[in-house]
Amino acid sequence: MVDGDTRPAVARAWIPLQPERAMQTPNDLPQPETVVVTATAVPARDLPVVGAALTIGDLPAHRDWLLEAPRDLELQSFVDAEVLNGDWAPAVAEARRLLDGHQGRLGIHGPFWGFTVTSYDPDVRAVVRKRLSQALDVCAALGADQIVIHSPFSTWGYNHRGLYPADAARMLDAARDTLSAALARAADMGVTFVLENIEDKDPADRAQLADALGWQALGLSVDTGHAHYAHVSTGAPPVDFFIRAAGPRLHHVHLQDADGYADRHWPLGMGTILWASVFAALRPLGPVPRLIIELRDKAGVIASARHLASLGLVR
């Protein structure tokens, strides 16, 4: 939780690496002393507890599971513009009723359809600022303290890095114009925005952008399926390197399985992600980020949690 404006006096300039070195290789990225690819013996009391990404409509079927342990929850009912522009107060009231007794941390997935947080169009940036402000309004009403937003980095942009030298500064200026007001308000509220990898090929890009913006109210999220897609389909490093590259800014992880071809959001164990390596990368980072199972079919959430428990990775 953040109290007030915690920006450093001078934010570090964000400068992408040269094209031939733009993406850090696995050897360049932060490494633990020992890379572990199989589950290690960790006392059960020290294992993390997983939560889930659900809509309000999914809560009744998962309420007992959510309340049996301090499970973190990400509500995904406040993503659409139609919802944010409408009367969402009844939805918040219903969520609060269903979550009575919930002891985990609460966040929301913020709006993302149709825009990026680094648009070069000032009119689009104005719309994005409005959407982020609306998301903060929802957090205030819900008592939530985290908002997931999407990374602006893409494979297209990565492959053209260096061809347009002004792009890095222009992107940073656009991000600052779009996000600064929301981050200032979030800091006052004790809310953290987390920037989720989408098409990111270089795991370090989001951390560099967050460092350049300089707000502690901006953290990072890693989506395991998105990272696996980037690894298999675009040549990015594997999922565990995305975890390590996020470092101390990692506040949130979307746990979903995939085959690396598409954004599957399969139940955990159905795809080809090496879960032992993911959790080995998480272990040295310190405070446990929110571990959020995010599936297309919510009926697989509890079974996915049990799968991780059977591997000795979570409680």
Segments (PLM) and residue ranges:
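N-terminal pre-domain/capping segments
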Residues: D3, P8-L136, A140, V314-R315
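Active-site beta-loop-alpha junctions enriched in small/polar residues
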Residues: T55-G57, Q76-D80, P111-W113, P152-S154, ...
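Catalytic-core regions built around general acid/base machinery
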Residues: A91-H102, T178-R185, S277-A281
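Histidine-acidic metal/acid-base catalytic patches
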Residues: W14-L17, Q24-P48, P60-E68, V117-T118, ...
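A general structural motif
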Residues: L47, P70-D72, G101-R105, C139-Q146, ...
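Active-site acidic/histidine proton-transfer and metal-coordination neighborhood
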Residues: T118-G219
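Non-membrane alpha-helical structural segments and their capping/turn regions in soluble enzymes
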Residues: A89-V92, P122-S133, P165, A169-R176, ...
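Hydrophobic faces of well-ordered beta-strands that scaffold small-molecule active sites
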Residues: P48-L54, L73-L75, L106-I108, I147-I149, ...
